[in-house]
Amino acid sequence: MPRYYCDYCDTYLTHDSPSVRKQHNAGYKHKANVRTYYQQFEEQQTQSLIDQRIKEHLGQAAAFQAGAPFNQHMLAFPGAVARPRLPILPTPGMPHGFPQAPLMPGVRPPILPAPGVPGYPGAPPTMPQPGAPPGSMPQPGAPPGSMPQPGAPPGSMPMQMAPLPRPPTLPPPTSGVPGAPIPNSAAPPAIYQANPPAPAGPTSGAPPAPPTAPQPAFSYALPSEGNH
């Protein structure tokens, strides 16, 4: 009678019947062997994928290293044209047509300047100084549109706009006669006089003030008690 072979457990069963297979598959040893088998299979697949990626990376690096000597060998032939290098941006003090140095390996190219920086291409032109000889260069570092002082020598600082004058401050309003001191709340009130006395004599050469007419006195009679 043929016997059943279990691939996970690597063993033969005593009988090849459905009941015996079911009993064997329900055992803890069979389940542990199945779990171990699939863990090993997953590890093998992961390792094979890692090895494949490493081989691809090494192949690309080897092809790049082999291509560098080949390019140098091709440049040795007459009539070969070298690959153009990246251009270098000129500095403000560098004249036009200045030979550009080749880029060194591992050195970053210069950073583009901010738009509007004086001295670089694309910056707004600066106005020349009035009275300066023709062909003179404007003052470096001056803001665009700044006007230098008229008649100033070349290279002088541009004329700066004076700030607007501040409006005059008005004094606080005062009550009473103009020019009188501000009354104090703690001082006693002055006694009002209807006709102030004339001065004793002239003090500054002015004519004396005319005398004032006396005020008429009014008297009122009190009503008697018999009138009530």
Curated annotation (Swiss-Prot):
Tree of life domain: Eukaryota
Zn-finger segments (Matrin-type): 4-36
Keyword Methyltransferase: no
Pfam families with a match to the protein in the record: zf-U1
Biased composition (Pro residues): 107-156, 164-175, 196-214
Primary location: nucleus
Biased segments, Low complexity type: 178-190
Signal peptide positions (record): none
Region named Disordered: 105-228
Keywords, ordered alphabetically: Metal-binding, Nucleus, Ribonucleoprotein, RNA-binding, Zinc, Zinc-finger
One BP annotation, GO: mRNA 5'-splice site recognition
GO MF, one annotated term: U1 snRNA binding
Any Gene Ontology CC annotation: commitment complex
Alphabetical list of InterPro entries matching this protein: Matrin/U1-C_Znf_C2H2, Matrin/U1-like-C_Znf_C2H2, U1-CZ_Znf_C2H2, U1_snRNP-C, Znf_C2H2_sf
Cellular localisation: Nucleus
Matching SMART domains: ZnF_U1
PANTHER family per record: U1 SMALL NUCLEAR RIBONUCLEOPROTEIN C
Assembly notes: U1 snRNP is composed of the 7 core Sm proteins B/B', D1, D2, D3, E, F and G that assemble in a heptameric protein ring on the Sm site of the small nuclear RNA to form the core snRNP, and at least 3 U1 snRNP-specific proteins U1-70K, U1-A and U1-C. U1-C interacts with U1 snRNA and the 5' splice-site region of the pre-mRNA.
Family recorded in the similarity comment: Belongs to the U1 small nuclear ribonucleoprotein C family.
HAMAP family noted in UniProt: U1_C (MF_03153)
Role: Component of the spliceosomal U1 snRNP, which is essential for recognition of the pre-mRNA 5' splice-site and the subsequent assembly of the spliceosome. U1-C is directly involved in initial 5' splice-site recognition for both constitutive and regulated alternative splicing. The interaction with the 5' splice-site seems to precede base-pairing between the pre-mRNA and the U1 snRNA. Stimulates commitment or early (E) complex formation by stabilizing the base pairing of the 5' end of the U1 snRNA and the 5' splice-site region.
Name of the molecule in the record: U1 small nuclear ribonucleoprotein C-2
Species in which this protein is naturally found: Sorghum bicolor
